Amino acid sequence: MAMTDPLGDMLTRIRNGAARRKSSVSTPASKLRARVLDVLQAEGYIRGYSEVEFGNGKAELNIELKYYEGASVIREIARVSKPGRRVYVSVKSIPQVANGLGITILSTPKGVMADHQAREQNVGGELLCSVF
């Protein structure tokens, strides 16, 4: 059976791995997932990720989770726009997460970026997820 929400699956793997204090989790590779992980790494929510290619043409992303004093840096990670209900926002209506302490990740015409970058570049888009 085909996966209906690959990004939601990746976020769930990160959430479950952090809850079980795993050092890393893996997920099937895609360009969108890699761009979201780029934003998470730039914002300091994960240590990094690497792409592992298999001989059959498939690839996986190994995500290194980040912890501070034994607790996960990611307290909450949630999908906002889902396959059954897409959420689009203009630059004026980009929400703040946890009063500015968290981030929202958007898919914009200029690429996948964090909410503060979208405000700087004056661009809206699809709200992919929120992280705190």
UniProtKB/Swiss-Prot annotation:
Signal sequence range: none
Stated family: Belongs to the universal ribosomal protein uS8 family.
SUPFAM superfamilies, per database record: Ribosomal protein S8 (SSF56047)
Official protein name in the record: Small ribosomal subunit protein uS8
Annotated GO biological process: translation
Cystine residue pairs: none
Physiological role: One of the primary rRNA binding proteins, it binds directly to 16S rRNA central domain where it helps coordinate assembly of the platform of the 30S subunit.
Keywords: Ribonucleoprotein, Ribosomal protein, RNA-binding, rRNA-binding
GO cellular component: ribonucleoprotein complex; ribosome
Pfam families tied to this protein: Ribosomal_S8 (PF00410)
Organism: Sinorhizobium fredii (strain NBRC 101917 / NGR234)
Entry GO MF terms: rRNA binding; structural constituent of ribosome
Quaternary structure and partners: Part of the 30S ribosomal subunit. Contacts proteins S5 and S12.
InterPro entries, sorted: Ribosomal_uS8, Ribosomal_uS8_CS, Ribosomal_uS8_sf
